[in-house]
């Protein structure tokens, strides 16, 4: 028959079928067969031609679509996306049809053309679609009503109703013909003609039976009267045929990218894949047939009778099924059981929603959406609280698995029938409402199943609940999609009060439940004792209970109160624990004994009772014995078990004591305290670093130092391999470590007599002038007299030598105190009561000041202050009237008394800081002079060497000056302060006169004008100020013979006699012996402020080794102090201390510590003793042996390290300066020269109170200095001859006597400079090639005069008067 849409297509289509295809093919009636041949078949008078489609057909269709939407490119692109999604299996055929239909809406020719490529059974209809949907609604409702009518009619005979559903289901599964259906239903409805007649309305008209034919004729008459189509049987058969012979849909990407295909091989491959895929989808598609039919429910109820009848038959087919003939009998019985089970589930489930959910689960399983395991999980959620129903469901499931797709078919029948009947009887719904309801439910089920798969096999401990809701710190809410296990025996009360959703996640197993508080070994011992006691108690209680039960039963048997007939059971008299006890009592034969007891209790019971009492007695005796053992364990371990900190402390302390950890600690503190403003300020002030200690410690108990020394000494004797190493380590401890910390030295018996030294800080020296002109020295103590006697006794009789000769030089000054570059240095000598003054040449002063480089802030200093800090010198003799350094006297001023330093109790510090003077034994050796740094200097001319008569002396070096190259170094001069005072008194004036003459004779070359660089400082500061014409002449005649470039020894560089170095160096103590090999290192230093508080400070600059040493020392000090403080109350805390008369607890602790160090005591014994003496807080002392070992090893490393020894020598060198003259910046710069880029630590110790502060200094990289080794020789010669040269003229023979009244100008100048701040920070740089001088950026000079407060007040008063006058003028 020719369909209406064919006419529409023929009249209105602009799309031409490629290769001459008919309209029928374009309408979707040309399936692609597997053989690929062309088929022709008659169907309702119409001729359909099925021809194989090619790629060209698809490309032609694409061109047509592209031309149609050439102005709407997005639609064409969307069509290509649909094809790509279908190829990638992201959508199925139904989805493609829906999207194409919507996309080509209004373009029927394209839709009909697209039908050409669809398989059989799939086509897009446009006209009939509007009529088909409302008809299905009426037919479906009538079918539902008919099925319910049958159910009500045969409610007492469920077999008929279930058999009817089984027949329909088999028909729906295409396993039963329509004739068989009618015959079986006729037999089933025998005696109920109304039901049979109503049933025939749903069947096709052409049936062989008479009743069916008669009914068909009446129906045909009705169809012909209404002019509708033939009966629907033919259409139903055609649809069934289409379902059986579904063609393969054309799959592929129909985009223009496929133009390169020139054959149909790809099409054949796609068709094969589609067949395989459709085979898997058949089962799911059959289940969707019902949903497709339900989609047509609308409010239209009127349609032709012929079509209505066919639609009713189709609705009945929705409930019909099919099964193979061999499985027919099994399915029948299973259907009956299934429906009975469903009714039982409905009755047990109180909620109708739960029952509907159960049916939905069966439905989605029958459609192949979920698997068997998923279904069982879903059903267990619903029926878990009914174990009997769950067991019956699982058994029924297993029986159905024996039949091919048995349960799936059964589930489909059960779900569709019951679900549809319950749903439709309760509330008929529209298709839109159904789809909107079922689709979210199916999606929710799928998501739930997916989440269950994720959570499957995972315990709650493995879940990540960090993002879940938190109720308390311990409890968190489980995820909403986490499957909650069903409690099978939960009561209603339990369901109300018990929790299923809030869980407390454990963090580990039982043994490690508290990772931050693990049980120590003593607790483990206690736990084992408790376990043993509990187990033995349980055994005793078990055997006692079994014995009582056996004895009671035996008494009953003896009294014959029980009969051993068939009703006797041994379990009625023995509990399970009793029987288990008897079984364990006999071991492998326990089951046999129980069997004998059951068979013959009268005979077996006495034997068993005897055995039970025997074991009971043995175990009681065993418990009594073990009680003593357990009591001993408790006594030993209870107190120790309370110590939870020692285990972790011992683990962590080994890391904390390592050098890496200590270094990291101070670096971290420095980074935290780092202030950007301080850094900028330090840079702007000439790279002066702020003094901000990173660590500070106090040493308030000095008695601890003695205990520490003894402990370290004891350990060193055990660890040091040689006596020499032991001596070096102990000397480092005493002479350096304790000296820095201000620890008083310990007595050494007669050794102190050999090395008597004088500490300037302990002397109160008053300088005065006697009437006869002799310098009088007043000593404040016996120490000075003892030293004076010793110095006199060291004299060798040489008239040029003097006992007690002192000569002190001053250190490098920070700035020109007066702020005047050409300030003349004045020396005031006092010999024979006559004061004289020597003024250095103006050119010499200018040259010295020009070469000096200054950094930092100047320190204003008047003459009195300079005199107070001046060096001490004793003239060694005089051969003429040359001026000798003496006491400085100012006009109108009283005599100046040297300010005594604070007297320290630290005698050992005095030993380290005093300059010991030894007289030489040979008459040919010159006088020994104590330098500013504590060294002796020979003043005889024989020790002076020079390359030329006009050059500077090689052996005259300035403190704080780096000397990498002698030639270059000698070209620089430094500013010198020449205030010198006498510190010893000659016995008579003649002796003083001789000494003065010798001094002048030996050192008058220092001011020789023939020297080109007369400003070069000698080893002693005052040496250059003593004028001697005879020495000048001798230098002119004798120093030309010296070899140019001769290397000088370090001792000679300091102006010392090499004979003294060789002969008497061994007589010096170790603290002074290191001074013989040191020299200044750095040329340029930054300014520092001299403060009164610095007089009590000991400053040491060291590297990482010294920092670690002081930190280990401090830790050891704290722990021993901790032990001493806690020893008083420790014994009261210990309950197991037996020796109550042990004496001093601290002394006992020290004895135990010595035993640990020498190996006589083990660590366990030491820990026990510490707990007994101090208590549980003694855990910090358990690692003392390791701490002391590290400390001794660090001492050994410092003694053996070359760089560390250099730092120690440099410290002694700096410490040898006169108190108050130590310049911190000089020291720091010298250390920087040594350690280069390593860390530098500033260790500062104050004496009152004893406090140690440690600071990690910044590594500031300053601008590089030009050393002589890298300077151009031509430029060096130019600088020496032109820039740094002085007048070569000789001095006149005589010198004018300078009276004190001539110093008035200088005094006025100094007074005028009071309150003035001068910073000479301007720097210049010179080009070595062009000799051009340029200023250095960011450098400047600074001059500021502080205004007096009085002047400010006067100015304010004047301004106030002027303001008042102005106001009066305005008011007038």
Curated annotation (Swiss-Prot):
SUPFAM superfamilies: PAH2 domain. Residues 272-315, 938-957 have a biased composition (Basic and acidic residues). The modification Phosphoserine is found at residue 1049. This is Paired amphipathic helix protein Sin3-like 1. One of its GO terms (cellular component) is nucleus. Residues 990-1013, 1028-1042 have a biased composition (Acidic residues). Keywords: Nucleus, Phosphoprotein, Repeat, Repressor, Transcription, Transcription regulation. GO terms for biological process: negative regulation of DNA-templated transcription. Residues 1-50, 210-244, 272-323, 764-783, 791-817, 934-1056 are annotated as: Disordered. Residues 210-222 have a biased composition (Low complexity). InterPro entries: HDAC_interact_dom (IPR013194), PAH (IPR003822), PAH_sf (IPR036600), Sin3-like (IPR039774), Sin3_C (IPR031693). Acts as a transcriptional repressor. A histone deacetylase (HDAC) activity is required for transcription repression. May play a role in telomere stability. Pfam families: PAH, Sin3_corepress, Sin3a_C. Its main location: nucleus. Interacts (via PAH3) with ALY2. Interacts (via PAH2) with TBP1. Interacts with ALY3, GATA21, TRP2, TKI1, VAL1, SKP1B, FBX5 and PUB14. One of its GO terms (molecular function) is transcription corepressor activity. Residues 51-121, 136-206, 331-400 form the PAH domain. It comes from Arabidopsis thaliana (Mouse-ear cress). Disulfide bonds: none annotated. It is found in: Nucleus.
